[in-house]
């Protein structure tokens, strides 16, 4: 890893590794094989560098919604390691009754803990709020990415979303060290400055509870 990546790792205690999974062009078995190969490469590189405090890495996936996911038998294999948490990326379109039923099945039939990825990205697609409101009444969790929290549009969204009283966690949306860098610290600082320490403390407690 680069010096920058090492510096980032030294500031973290645990990192969730959640590569994208798209059921319309991938098989779970193939995805898991590639993920394991990448994970071994990563851990080998970490072992070859002085990364300071030992870091906990958990494998997972960011699973893009597909019709029928609520009944998918192997879906549990994509949960975050050591948990029953499924990080679910929702459609970038108007949400429908079918989507609601699938999410409900994941919770009630599959007995999974659903964490909806980067919820701020779906807001503009919801011309009707009916299904949006129904989904966020389900016992699930929502993730907000830390990038751009100080921008007006995102601040406005967070303020509105907080009224739904859905438990929140934060994500860095880190994809690389050039264009989509780790930004968790900056995002946390912005969140604290704008919304106060109480919200940040509540988020920390939610994250701790989910990953215990």
Spans of model-derived segments:
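Short acidic/polar active-site loop segments enriched in Thr and Asp
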Residues: 13-14, 112, 168
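Mid-to-C-terminal alpha-helical segments outside catalytic/metal-binding sites
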Residues: 184, 188-212
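Short beta-strand segments at enzyme active-site cores
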Residues: 13-20, 58-60
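Single conserved hydrophobic/aromatic residue that forms the stacking wall/gate
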Residues: 1-9
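Short acidic/histidine-rich active-site segments
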Residues: 18-20, 166-182
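Active-site metal-binding loops of divalent metal-dependent hydrolases
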Residues: 20-21, 62-63, 119, 147-148, ...
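Histidine/acidic-residue-rich catalytic or RNA/ligand-binding cores of hydrolases
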Residues: 126-133, 152-164, 178-190
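Extended substrate/RNA-proximal surfaces in nucleic-acid metabolism proteins
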Residues: 26-143
């Amino acid at each position: 890893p680069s010096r920058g990546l090492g510096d980032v790792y030294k500031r973290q205690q645990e990192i969730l590794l959640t590569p994208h999974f798209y059921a319309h062009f991938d098989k779970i078995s193939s995805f898991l094989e590639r993920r394991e190969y990448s994970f071994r490469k990563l851990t080998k590189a970490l072992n070859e560098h002085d990364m300071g405090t030992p870091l906990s890495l958990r494998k997972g996936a960011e699973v893009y919604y597909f019709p029928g996911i609520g009944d998918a038998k192997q879906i549990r294999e994509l949960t975050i390691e050591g948990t029953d948490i499924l990080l679910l990326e929702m459609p970038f379109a108007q949400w429908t009754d079918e989507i609601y039923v699938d999410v409900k099945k994941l919770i009630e039939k599959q007995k999974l803990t659903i964490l909806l990825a980067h919820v701020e990205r779906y807001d503009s697609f919801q011309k009707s709020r009916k299904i949006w409101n129904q989904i966020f009444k389900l016992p699930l969790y929502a993730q907000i990415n830390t990038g751009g929290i100080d921008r007006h549009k995102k601040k406005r969204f967070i303020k509105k979303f907080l009224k739904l009283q859905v438990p929140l966690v934060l994500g860095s949306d880190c994809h690389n060290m050039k264009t989509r860098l780790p930004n968790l610290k900056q995002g946390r600082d912005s969140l604290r400055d704008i919304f106060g320490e109480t919200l940040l403390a509540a988020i920390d407690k939610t994250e701790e509870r989910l990953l215990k």
